[in-house]
Regions:
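Serine/threonine-rich, repeat-prone extracellular segments and beta-strand-based repeat modules
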Residues: 1-12, 65-104, 141-184, 221-269
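Gram-positive cell-envelope targeting signals
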Residues: 1-37
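Short amphipathic alpha-helical surface micro-motifs
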Residues: 16-20, 26, 53-57, 86-88, ...
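Sparse, context-dependent recognition of short Cys/His-centered cofactor- or disulfide-binding micro-motifs
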Residues: 19-23, 28, 57-59, 75, ...
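Solvent-exposed, low-complexity, repeat-rich "mucin-like" stalks and linkers
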Residues: 27-65, 112-145, 189-224
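Flexible, low-complexity linkers/stalks enriched in Thr/Pro that connect modular domains
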Residues: 28-30, 106-111, 183-187, 267-269
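General "foldedness" signal
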Residues: 50, 72-74, 86, 104-106, ...
Length: 269
C-alpha cells in the first residue's frame, strides 16, 4: 500500500513538472530579434529604381519565425553625402513585433540634378502668381514629379517683364536654381501657338529641334494644321556652344490673317 502511494505521488509530481515545463516552453517570450543580411555593403541602381530594386540582395531571418525576407521594409533613405552616396536603412519585424534595422550605402548609376518644367508660354496677357504657380514645376530623376518643392521668388516688374528666381531640391538634397523672365503682353492675338516644351534643356555642343517643338496652332478650340508652315522662330542670340539661357519667340508670319506669339526658353548646360 505504501509503495502504491509513493508511486502515485511520484507520477503526480512528474505530471505536474511536465505540465509546468510544457507551459514554460510554450508560452515563453521570443527574446531574439530578427537578423538582416546584405550580399554587399553598397547597392548600385538606376536613379528611378523601384522599391523592389532597392531590396535586392537583402534577406532577413528570425530564430523562431524563420525566413522574413518578404517582410523587409525600407525605413529611410538619407540625402547625399560628399561622394553622392546615400544611406538606405531597412527594417523588419518578427511575429512578436520585435524589430531590427540595418543600413548600407546606395549609389546611383546615372543621376541628374532636378530640372524645372514650364507648361505654358512665358509670354502671357495675365500677370498673376496663380498663373505662374500653375505653369512652373520640376522633375527629379529619383523622385519623379516634385512640383510641390518648387520655390518661386519674383523680382521687380519693369518694362512688362518680371524676373522669376526658381529653386527646387529633391530627396537627395540636391538643389537646382534657374532665373527666368515672365513677360506681360496684352495684345489680342487671334490664335495660339502650342509648344511641346516651353523650357528646353540641351547640353553645350548639342542642338534642340525648335521646329519639331511646335505642337499645333489653335484658333479657338480648332487646330489649323495649315498654319504650322507659317510659324516663324526668332532665336535671338542663341549659341549652343555657350552655356546660358536663351529666349525663343514663336509667331505667325504676315502671309496669314491670324496672329499669335509665344515664348520658350532654351537652357544650354
Amino acid at each position: 500500500m505504501k509503495h502504491k502511494q509513493v508511486l502515485s505521488l511520484f507520477l503526480t509530481l512528474v505530471l505536474i513538472g511536465g505540465y509546468i515545463a510544457f507551459q514554460y516552453y510554450y508560452n515563453k517570450d521570443d527574446n531574439t530579434a530578427p537578423v538582416i543580411t546584405f550580399d554587399s555593403d553598397m547597392i548600385k541602381v538606376k536613379a528611378d529604381a523601384s522599391d523592389e530594386d532597392l531590396l535586392e540582395g537583402v534577406t532577413a531571418s528570425d530564430q523562431e519565425d524563420g525566413d522574413l525576407t518578404d517582410d523587409i521594409l525600407i525605413d529611410s533613405i538619407s540625402a547625399f553625402n560628399s561622394e553622392e552616396e546615400r544611406t538606405i536603412t531597412y527594417v523588419v519585424f518578427d511575429k512578436d513585433n520585435k524589430s531590427t534595422s540595418a543600413s548600407r550605402k546606395l549609389k546611383y548609376k546615372k543621376y541628374t540634378a532636378p530640372k524645372f518644367t514650364v507648361s505654358d508660354s512665358l509670354l502671357q496677357s495675365s500677370l498673376t502668381m496663380t498663373k505662374i504657380n500653375t505653369m512652373i514645376g520640376a522633375t527629379s530623376s529619383v523622385d519623379g514629379n516634385i512640383d510641390g518643392n518648387v520655390e518661386i521668388k519674383t523680382g521687380t516688374y519693369e518694362d512688362h517683364k518680371m524676373p522669376l528666381d526658381l529653386t527646387v531640391s529633391d530627396s537627395t538634397g540636391t538643389e537646382s536654381h534657374l532665373s527666368l523672365i515672365y513677360e506681360y503682353d496684352n495684345t489680342s492675338y487671334t490664335s495660339d501657338i502650342v509648344l511641346k516644351k516651353y523650357l528646353i534643356y540641351v547640353k553645350a555642343g548639342k542642338e534642340a529641334d525648335l521646329e519639331d517643338n511646335i505642337d499645333s496652332v489653335m484658333v479657338g478650340n480648332s487646330e489649323y494644321v495649315d498654319l504650322m508652315d507659317h510659324v516663324v522662330i526668332k532665336r535671338g542670340d542663341l549659341d549652343y556652344d555657350v552655356p546660358g539661357l536663351y529666349d525663343i519667340y514663336y509667331s505667325l508670319d504676315d502671309e496669314t490673317n491670324f496672329t499669335a506669339k509665344c515664348k520658350a526658353v532654351v537652357v544650354v548646360q
